[in-house]
Amino acid sequence: MKSSPSLSDSLAGLSQNPQEILHRLRMERERRAKAAEQKRIEENAAEIRARCEASHLEFSKEMFPHLEGAGLRVGPHHAAMSTALDRVFAGQCKRLIINVPPGYTKTVFAGVMFLAMGFALNPRARFIYSSFSEALVKETSGNARDLMKTPEFQALWPRQLRKDTEGKGRWKTLEGGGLLAAPAGGTITGFRAVTMEPGFTGALIIDDPLKPDDADSDTERPKINKRWHTTFKSRLAHEDVPVVIIMQRLHPDDMSGYLLSGEGGDEWEHLMLPVMIDPDEIYPDEFTHGRPIDHGLKPGPLWPAKHTEKHIELLQHDEFVYSAQYAQRPIAPGGAIFREEHLVGWDEL
C-alpha cells in the first residue's frame, strides 16, 4: 500500500517564497485533518450512526462541519428546535410551527439538516421544501444534496442520487425518495410529500413563506396564506403528513398568525423563540389552534453568543422590526404606524 507523502516530501522542490510555503503547509494540514476525520468516522461508524439517528441535534453537530467547514456553535435554541424536530421524526408531531429570529441558523437546522437526516433515516423519504426566496430554495436544496454526497455522510449512510435528477430544484434517490424545492408563490405539481408506507417517510417544510417587503401588502400576504389551502395541503400524500413551518414573524396575519388562529382548521404544536426569553410572558389568546411547547429555556437572551442584552437593547430602538422579527409578537397595523420599509429582509439562515 502506498503511504501518504510526508511534510518534507510535500515541501520538496519549493522555492523559498514564504507565501508559497505557507500555502502548501495549510493545504497539508487540511489534508491531514480530513484524513483523520474520515478515519474517526470509519472506525466509529456504528456508534456515530446510532447517535445521529436518535437525535437531530447530534446529527447536526456531526454533519455541520462538513457543510460549513467549521463546527456548530450550539445555542440553547438549537436544542429546543431539535427536540421539536425529533418529535416529527418519531411520528409524534404532525403539525409544527417554529418562530425564531433571523440569523439563528433556522434554515440550516430545519432545512438542510432536517432533510439530510430524513434521508439518512429513510432513503425513500419524499420532501417538499418551500420558501419565499427562490435563491434560498435552491441553496438549501443544493446544500442538502451536497452534504449527502460528502465522504463523511456516505461513510455512515451510503445514499445514492439518480444522475438524471440532480438539479437543485428537484432530485431523487435511487431508492425512490426525493426532494422538490419550489418558491412559496410558485408552482408545486407532479410530486407529493411522503409515501403511504409506515414510519417516517418525509415532510412538507415551509421556511419563511412571506417576503418581508410583502408583509404589509393586503394582496400578497393573503395570497400566500391562501396557498396553504390551494397548494400546500394538496401536495400531501395523506392528512397525517408532517408539516414543519419555520419562520420569523412579520405581521399579525402572516402564515403563522393565520394558522395558529384557526384559519386552516389544524392544531399546531408551536415553539415560539423570542430573542429575549421571558418566562412570565403569556401565550396569545388569539392562538386558539396553537399548542405552546414548553422549551424550558432560562430567562435572558435566546443565544447569548449572538445577541447579548446590550445588543437586544439596540434592536429595540425599532419597535416594528423588534416586535415582529425578534420578539415574535408583531404589532397590529391598527395599533401603530406599520410600514413595510421597517422590515429587514433575510434570505438565509
Predicted ranges, named:
Residues 108-111, 138-142, 253-260:
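A short acidic (Asp/Glu
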Residues 169-231:
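Conserved RecA-like ASCE ATPase "motif II neighborhood" in helicase/translocase motors
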Residues 1-94:
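N-terminal accessory segments
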Residues 93-113:
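Walker A/P-loop
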Residues 130-187:
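Conserved nucleotide-state-sensing and coupling region of NTP-binding domains
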Residues 110-122:
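Walker A/P-loop NTP-binding motif
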Residues 283-349:
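ATPase catalytic-site recognition across NTP-hydrolyzing enzymes
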Residues 216-292:
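ASCE P-loop NTPase helicase motor core
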